[in-house]
């Protein structure tokens, strides 16, 4: 899972640091954290990407659980870079699965943000080239009902997503 790789390898420190910043606002926890008496870490798993989604946050009113748009944009850029890096790890994981586990087949769950970080029309796109050299790319085209089910699932349990900067700016302007 690319999202798991993003949340552990590439954004794990950002996530943990956000927890530590929150803990430092509580004197009791701050004292324990500064004396290395407690350890704060996310418990991200293949089935639970909530730490990553929670860190990415939602732009909006802080009193309602939102974060300032500038902070959201910063986190989106972190996520975009992490998405690219994790996708470029695919070849390494494919060869590793063969070498260590003797798996003849490797499935890369690229995640929903792949469309935001690649240009399939560009023959020199580094991510698309890497993926096409190491995998067979499969596009699963969903129906309108599938799209509706994904939207409903996203509302209940948001998946980590990165958005193209121009799209995000346009949607933010429409929102405010």
Residue ranges and their predicted role:
Residues 1-10:
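Short beta-strand-centered segment that lines the nucleotide-binding/catalytic pocket of NTP-utilizing
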Residues 10-120:
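ATP-dependent small-molecule kinase phosphotransfer cores
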Residues 38-47, 146-155, 176:
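Noncatalytic linker/hinge segments flanking ATPase motor cores
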Residues 109, 124-171:
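Conserved phosphate-donor/acceptor-positioning beta-strand/loop module used by diverse small-molecule
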Residues 8-9, 115-116, 145-151:
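Switch/connector loops and helix/strand junctions flanking conserved nucleotide-binding motifs
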Residues 60-73, 155-176:
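A solvent-exposed, charged loop/short amphipathic helix patch at secondary-structure junctions
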Residues 27-38, 135-142, 171-173:
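Short, surface-exposed, charge-dense and proline/glycine-enriched linear segments
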Residues 3, 53, 138-140:
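Compositionally biased, low-complexity repeat tracts
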């Amino acid at each position: 899972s690319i999202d798991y790789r993003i949340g552990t390898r590439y954004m794990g420190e950002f996530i943990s640091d956000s927890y530590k910043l929150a803990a430092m606002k509580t004197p009791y926890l701050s004292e324990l954290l500064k004396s290395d008496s407690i350890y704060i870490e996310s418990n991200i798993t293949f089935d639970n990407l909530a730490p990553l989604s929670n860190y990415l946050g939602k732009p909006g009113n802080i009193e309602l659980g939102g974060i300032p748009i500038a902070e959201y944009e910063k986190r989106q850029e972190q996520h975009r870079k992490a998405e690219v890096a994790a996708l470029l790890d695919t070849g390494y994981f494919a060869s590793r699965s063969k070498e260590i586990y003797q798996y003849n087949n490797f499935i890369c769950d690229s995640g929903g943000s792949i469309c935001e970080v690649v240009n399939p029309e560009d023959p020199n796109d580094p991510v698309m080239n890497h993926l096409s050299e190491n995998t067979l790319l499969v596009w699963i085209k969903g129906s309108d009902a599938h799209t509706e089910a994904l939207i409903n699932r996203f509302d209940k349990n948001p998946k980590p997503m990165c958005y193209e900067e121009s799209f995000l700016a346009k949607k933010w302007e429409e929102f405010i």
